[in-house]
Amino acid sequence: MIYNEKLYNSLLSMEEKFNDLNKELETEGLSVKRMSEINKSIKETTPIVEKFKEYKRTLNDIDSAEKLIKSEKDNEIIELAQLELSEKKPLIEKYEYELKVLLLPKDPNDDKNVIVEMRPAAGGDESSIFVGDLFSAYKRYADSLGWKVKMLEVQESSHGYGFISFMINGENVYSKMKFESGVHRVQRVPATESKGRVHTSTITVAVLPELEEVELVINNSDLKIDTYRASGAGGQHINKTESAVRITHIPTGIFVACQEGKSQIENRETAMKMLRAKLWEKKEEENRKNISDLRKGQVGTGERAEKIRTYNYPQNRVTDHRINLTLNKLDNVMLGNLSEIIDSLISHDEAVKMQEAKI
């Protein structure tokens, strides 16, 4: 029995192509280019084919159990078959959902590392303080997933931070962190507030994918590169060498700076990564402006001006406005336990894409 014939036939066709590609890979005299294309297709399709095999096995088990119930006269065997049915049938819906997710068009940046920029917005000192608080939550979240955080630039203010930028390296980082772009609002009583009044402040977060040189080519003639002495902690060495680097992209006026590395070469390489990410962001913003009919149900636009989440300290509540998700455990979230929020955003985004794709 096939529960979803359209899905089944689509997967069957994909499996046949997958098998054909594996056979072609064994062909003698295959060009390096074609071999690379085949290996890429096989890598992308393997998770779908493996899941489809599980799906087919479950369908066959259900079919066998149903036939056994109809033909068997031994009550004990019938009961065992009915038990198997009760265990296997719920798996069909689960596998079909997982297969639909695997069939969705992939964001080409999902497997990339990210560059994150955090800035205070409205709210003065409280805003600057919350930049540090949310950064700590991101750092713990990254640590919990085995990701590595590398500081790029830190600007301290009198009571917090005027700017923090950092890179996160790991598996599929952008697929999760991209949902953090936007305006984060915090509501709490400042330490200096004598009357216990709740103040509201905001910070902005931008999450950019780290791009390879071949993905976004920058002409050296378009760059103005300055070096200067790094500031901040680091002892005498920092003041003796011009290890900090500032790169300006002349055509756009976009500039980046990096001083956290140990050498000028390291800072220059990092600054170029930052610049590629910023130029990508500019291009994406232009694309969004040119598209008149953005999909209405998407999980936010990713624009910095969009208020995405509120952190209410007096009520220990965090609300993500894009999916109307409220959790009454802000203290836990700020310890880096962001998975429940981010996973919910991913699930919502997948559901919307499925509806649009009519899968």
From Swiss-Prot:
PTM sites of type N5-methylglutamine: 236
Pfam family, one: PCRF
InterPro entries with a match to the protein in the record: PCRF (IPR005139), Pep_chain_release_fac_I (IPR000352), Pep_chain_release_fac_I_sf (IPR045853), Prokaryotic/Mito_RF (IPR050057), RF-1 (IPR004373)
PANTHER family: LD18447P
Source organism per UniProt: Malacoplasma penetrans (strain HF-2)
Coiled-coil positions: none
Family recorded in the similarity comment: Belongs to the prokaryotic/mitochondrial release factor family.
Protein name: Peptide chain release factor 1
Major location category of this protein: cytoplasm
NCBIfam families, sorted: prfA, PRK00591.1
Cell compartments where the protein resides: Cytoplasm
GO cellular component: cytoplasm
Molecular-function annotations in GO: translation release factor activity, codon specific
Keywords carried by this UniProt record: Cytoplasm, Methylation, Protein biosynthesis
Post-translation changes: Methylated by PrmC. Methylation increases the termination efficiency of RF1.
Function per UniProt: Peptide chain release factor 1 directs the termination of translation in response to the peptide chain termination codons UAG and UAA.
HAMAP family reported for this sequence: Rel_fac_1
